């Protein structure tokens, strides 16, 4: 939606006419659904063409058990043993040079059954991808029990990540 709006407004400012439908079509070609991204990368061990992925509502990513059940029942893949955050990081970690994962986290929402929360992203980075550069909003640690309520993971993030005040969408 934001890309569509921006494209139409930018075209207007430069004296061009772009229809909302055309802008939306281009935006959809630019953005891939996370589930398609996941499925595409199950088929290959190679790095994806995408260098940047944005995971909206990242706190809703699935725990290992939920993903494993889904992969077995819906995709016919037995013994899938990664959470959604760990899998996404593993796919992007295939790049030899650089890549980025941007996790957008909604505030004030309960975590539902099977959802991993922010802690699973941090746990995956801590246990398997500790060489990654991590940048996070100061809001992640500002309110106890809101985003990250595991003291060990909070401490690890503070020691290994880079806290920024300008990464919150309210900025």
Residue spans for each PLM region:
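Conserved helicase motor core of SF1/SF2 NTP-dependent helicases
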Residues: 2-18, 52-171
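Inter-Walker segment of RecA-like/P-loop motor cores
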Residues: 2-53
């Amino acid at each position: 939606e934001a890309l569509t709006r921006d494209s139409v407004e930018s075209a207007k400012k430069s004296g061009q006419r772009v229809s909302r439908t055309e802008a939306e079509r281009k935006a959809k070609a630019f953005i891939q659904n996370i589930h398609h991204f996941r499925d595409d990368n199950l088929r290959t061990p190679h790095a994806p063409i995408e260098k940047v992925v944005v995971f909206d509502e990242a706190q809703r990513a699935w725990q290992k058990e939920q993903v494993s059940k889904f992969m077995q029942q819906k995709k016919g893949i037995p013994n899938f043993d990664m959470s959604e955050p760990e899998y996404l990081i593993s796919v992007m970690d295939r790049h030899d040079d650089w890549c980025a994962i941007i996790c957008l986290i909604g505030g004030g929402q309960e975590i539902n059954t099977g959802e991993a929360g922010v802690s699973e992203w941090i746990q995956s980075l801590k246990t398997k991808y500790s060489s990654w550069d991590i940048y996070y909003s100061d809001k992640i640690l500002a309110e106890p029990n809101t985003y990250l309520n595991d003291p060990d993971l909070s401490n690890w993030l503070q020691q290994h990540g880079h806290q920024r005040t300008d990464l919150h969408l309210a900025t």
